[in-house]
Amino acid sequence: MQLIEVSAKTGYVWFRQGIWLFRRNPLAFVTLFFTYLLAMMLVSLVPVIGAALPLLLIPGIAVGFMAACRDTIAGKQVLPTILIDGFRSYGPIVTQRLLTLGGLYIVSMAAVFACSALGDGGTLLKIMFGLGAENLGPDALESPGFKIAALIAAALYAPVAMMFWFAPVLTAWHDVPPVKALFFSVVSCWRNKGAFTVYGLLWFALALGVSFGLAALMQALGASAYALMVMMPASIVITAMLYCSFYATYRGCFGVQEPGAPKLPNTSDR
């Protein structure tokens, strides 16, 4: 495993590579995303622990998305079952480590939203973990305290995202123990913070541009009432492309995970 340091403009390359990868097999990636959403919804219905189960499974599912990207580049068929690739293809030790990462992710997210309670007294925490959120009125979501809590959560989530950005795939594909994987992930994200900043701004600009563009178009057509109906599939496509770009960031920061693995195109010159 080699940790690669890249320039800020590489963030644009990752952005383009994510879109290119999605275009290789758009139907498969949209299907994967829908399958993921459905699975997480069903898992969350489990009594008592349902709110935490999706977080527990996220690291393993992340490996599945990465495997789907790898197989798409290799020209292999991608089926929804690849989402559980992390739990079935690398042995019981890797499965245990991925679940350990999931447990650490639960603790990290609980800490983030617990701190957000300083802003709104725990409203956001209740919503995210299903702790009596059904009793909250609409006024609670519109209060200044709730907005402050959201800002606190967003700020604290940044280091959590850095820890878990590469940790699952490092654990599954490089046999790195969970704690070391979290450390290497943070180091890689920090060393390439310029590229990640450009990368994040580009995705934010795309999402914002599509949202405003579709809203303006629907208003011009006199169909504003249907704007949300049009925006939902657009949001799904953008999110699926974003997920594809995660693989590009991994390859950009750590190179090829195995001998003979297919290469991503360098889209910087296109």
UniProtKB/Swiss-Prot annotation:
The chain crosses the membrane at residues 24-44, 45-65, 98-118, 150-170, 198-218, 226-246. InterPro entries: BPSS1780-like. Its main location: membrane. Disruption phenotype: Disruption confers resistance to cellular contact-dependent growth inhibition (CDI) CdiA-2 of B.pseudomallei strain 1026b, but not to endogenous CdiA. Unchanged binding to B.pseudomallei strain 1026b inhibitor cells. Keywords: Cell inner membrane, Cell membrane, Membrane, Transmembrane, Transmembrane helix. (Microbial infection) Probably transports the toxic C-terminal region of CdiA-2 from B.pseudomallei strain 1026b across the inner membrane to the cytoplasm, where CdiA has a toxic effect. Expression in E.coli makes the bacteria sensitive to the tRNase domain of B.pseudomallei strain 1026b CdiA-2. This is Probable inner membrane protein BTH_II0599.
